[in-house]
Amino acid sequence: MYEHSKKSQDLAVRLQRFMDEHIYPNEEAYAHQLKAAENRFAPLPLMDELKLEAKEAGLWNLFVPEEHAEYCDHGGLSFFDYAPLAEIMGRVIWCPEVFNCNAPDTGNMEVFMNYATEAQQREWLDPLLAGDIRSSYAMTEPQVASSDATNVELRIEKAGNEWVLNGHKWFITNAMYERTKILIVMGKSDPENPSRHLQQSQILVPKDTPGVKLVRPLTTLGYDDAPIGHAEIIFENVRVPLDNILLGEGRGFEIAQGRLGPGRMHHCMRLIGAAQRSLELACHRANSRTTFGRLLSKHQSVREDISKCFSEIEMARLLLLKACHKIDTQGVPASVDMIAATKTTIPFLVQKVIDRCMQIHGAGGLTEDYMMAEAYNYARWCRQADGPDQVHQMALGKQIIDRFSG
């Protein structure tokens, strides 16, 4: 059940080689370019160089699923076969963009594949697949509990041959990035509809549209996640053509449900890679540092921590692969239980793993000298992103209880 296809295994070997030759040796250079940049949200020259090399190596758009094989050169991958590749990429927080496999663009590209018109695909999907532009998904709002997607208040009103948007969004990933050109915006177009799930629509808004105001970059645990950033945005009388609606009026919630499930899985895949690398670094540290006359690796408490980390990573990986297998064989709608279990379990486990590995590194584990502090921030962020743990646990608990209610 858990043996990956030969195509996936071959890609994993090539991807690991690329990481060894191009990514790990450039981690310090990337950090230096980012710190030296006059504009932290501008594209970095090193990133563009690495993207060209990844394209030439045939390691591009690896996220594209089998059913959309026409959009990639590798023939598409199942969730199960993509998992080990995303795990490898997750070992360096910024490197998924090198392979055009970064959030939220992967999810947004799948939205365009599944729900956009041919004209919308030509205008936005094609340059996204080429890596020429980036995108944002504007859903979360500061004034309401956006974990309930039906709460969104941004208004979408029809005025002649245009949609007019007014509202307030925040934590919109990618929106600060200069290369981001298109926002997928969710809001209420029919607030009086008796069905709460038919009140929303999703509208395509070019970022340079008059009335789109980037208020500020937001931080998570002090990280601004440059150069992509998480923005607070105000939409003030933003006007776009009627053709900029996705799928149709009242279909916004449907699109959100179709988009967010796979995105949650991708985050968990990458997090396992971050946890695995943290464990490896902790083991190297334990074998090289001495306290009280003994290597750290000789201390019982360190061995216990390493044991817990190993076990929790294995648990997380197996849970993820079972969820991937169910998605591949039964589809996303039938797999919401496993997606919820994965989404609520893996970020929490990874956060614990990285915390122990940081502790083994002493004060250095808290610094930018190692990847763990940023990875910890990513894991903690994932417990809120795409819906907080509690919402998914509530829905999953109800689903499990209902199975045994009759």
Task: Please give the residue ranges for each predicted region.
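A short, Trp-centered hydrophobic/proline-enriched beta-strand micro-motif
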Residues: 131-140, 185
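A short core secondary-structure module
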Residues: 161-162, 166-215
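Alpha-helical interface subdomain recognition
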Residues: 1-95, 102, 115-120, 127-132, ...
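Flexible, glycine-rich active-site loops centered on histidine and acidic residues
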Residues: 109-115, 192
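Short glycine/proline-enriched turns and hinge-like loops at secondary-structure junctions
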Residues: 77, 147-150, 175-180, 195-198, ...
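Short, conserved phosphate-binding/catalytic loop or strand-edge motifs used
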Residues: 102-109
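Cytochrome P450 core scaffold surrounding the K-helix E-X-X-R motif
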Residues: 73, 146, 214, 244-249
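Flexible, small-/acidic-enriched active-site or ligand-binding loops
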Residues: 151, 210-239
